[in-house]
Amino acid sequence: MRKGYKKLEGSRDFVIDTLGNGVYSLGEKNGNERGTFMSHYELIGFDMDGTILNSQKTISHRTLEAVNRAARMGKRVILSTGRCISELEEFRDVLANVSHYVCESGALIYDAVNQSILHSETLPRDLVEQVLETAAHEDVMVYMMSKGQALANASQVADTSHYHMGVYQEMMDRVVNKTDDIAALYRKHPFPVEKLNLFSASADIRERLHSRICGLPLAIAFAEGASLELSPLNVSKASGLVWLCGHLDIPLHQTIIVGDADNDAQVLQIAGLSVAMGNALPHIKELCDVVVADNDHDGCAEAVDRYLLEA
């Protein structure tokens, strides 16, 4: 197979043109590998941190223009993020042309146009309690996501830099529902938890936590800083995309996903076209079809212009 093409899984007759924007028949009879054009990509999904957001946690003018141009051309633009709904509020107006959020690493699907939750998956109560008990013995900030909202201890939110999350200080001050003792609150009045983040004070603490909980039936991802992201078993950005594509009646091979980190790996592997940011982890670049510029040089705009809209 020529570089730039990959076989469409389960098919002998079609390839994905990873350097263009469609699915093509092999055209064996006339010797034309590209063959007959079959369909265009209809949906593009962006991770937030490290992808559509630059190092200053803002969206550049060029990237925003590309998002809006894609929407005007009738393409679906979505977010594929570990963030919850409340953590995305500050971007709601600027990203008005984003139709859906696959948020909380796939545990919650949100209709941004109608501002409604379409689907969610929650962690079993006994698993949440086991994780809380384990975390109680370490210097770790427990950060829960429930019904699209964030909850954490007020004392820890006041010093996020201690947990290597200082870049999010202003956001957490603004959006987190703060309590004195989140573990005690949960045990007294259990509430649905879609996702549970553990922000550790050091990488060693994260390793100890991981060794103690890795046997639990959870989806566990290493994330930025010294954090762990815990989701319901078999829930990921990939499962979220599958659910949303079913809801929107868009085949997976007509999707483009852009990402940079470990929690993007599974969804990148199932997308029609996987795009790694220039700042992506080396193994993420290896598994992707193409690599674009980094998040400080409008890699997302490049993905839109080169692979979604270019004929």
Stretches with model-predicted labels:
Residues 70, 81, 105, 196, ...:
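Residue-level signal for inorganic ion chemistry
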Residues 42-55:
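Asp-based phosphoryl-transfer active-site loop
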Residues 74-78, 97-99, 194-196, 253-254, ...:
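Short active-site oxyanion
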Residues 57-73, 120-127, 179-181, 234-246, ...:
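Short, acidic loop-to-helix structural element flanking the phosphoryl-transfer center
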Residues 134, 138-141, 145-258:
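Conserved acidic, metal-coordinating active-site core of Asp-based
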Residues 17-37:
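Short, Lys/Arg-enriched N-terminal segments with co-localized hydrophobic residues
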Residues 39-43, 60, 228-311:
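Mg2+-dependent phosphoryl-transfer enzymes with acidic/Ser/Thr/Gly-rich catalytic loops
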Residues 61-165:
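Active-site phosphate-binding/coordination module
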